[in-house]
Swiss-Prot record:
Ribosomal protein found in the keyword field: yes
InterPro entries in the record: Ribosomal_uL13, Ribosomal_uL13_bac-type, Ribosomal_uL13_CS, Ribosomal_uL13_sf
Chain's role: This protein is one of the early assembly proteins of the 50S ribosomal subunit, although it is not seen to bind rRNA by itself. It is important during the early stages of 50S assembly.
One term under GO cellular component: cytosolic large ribosomal subunit
Organism field: Clostridium beijerinckii (strain ATCC 51743 / NCIMB 8052) (Clostridium acetobutylicum)
Keywords annotated in UniProt: Ribonucleoprotein, Ribosomal protein
Gene3D superfamilies named among the record's database cross-references: Ribosomal protein L13
PANTHER family: LARGE RIBOSOMAL SUBUNIT PROTEIN UL13M, RIBOSOMAL PROTEIN L13
The name this protein goes by in its record: Large ribosomal subunit protein uL13
NCBIfam families reported in the protein's UniProt record: rplM_bact (TIGR01066)
CDD domains in the cross-refs: Ribosomal_L13
GO MF annotation: an example: mRNA binding
Quaternary structure and interacting proteins, as annotated: Part of the 50S ribosomal subunit.
GO biological process, any: translation
Amino acid sequence: MKSYIAKASEIERKWYVVDAAGKPLGRVASQVASILRGKNKPTFTPNVDCGDFVIVINAEKVVLTGKKLDQKLMRKHSLYPGGLKETPYRVVLDKKPEFAFEEAVRRMLPNGVLGRQMLKKLNVYRGAEHNHAAQKPEVLELRY
């Protein structure tokens, strides 16, 4: 018996809505990354983008457990000497909760062209409203 290898033309993509209100950032991000990658499908193929589209709503209401809100830092470097910028997650979640969520998911996806292609299927919204009603997304209940 041969192994099944999915082709890009054979893949059927669904749309899912995930409500992140009151849920831990990392747990939601790991499940979203798994769906974007396509690991929830029996036809998963590692070298093909076979994942589904995901809409995340209420990103501003996501929580971090413990003292991570003040102790965990978002770091970026300008590549100049002394160019390290560190921002606590409390500030990041107040100003740009969409960015914090996208970064968490991006770091869980593969690096390279395939990971960037998967990340394009992620739509994160601050509030409960989204403009993808025409795609008829299904509500996805998270395992946690």
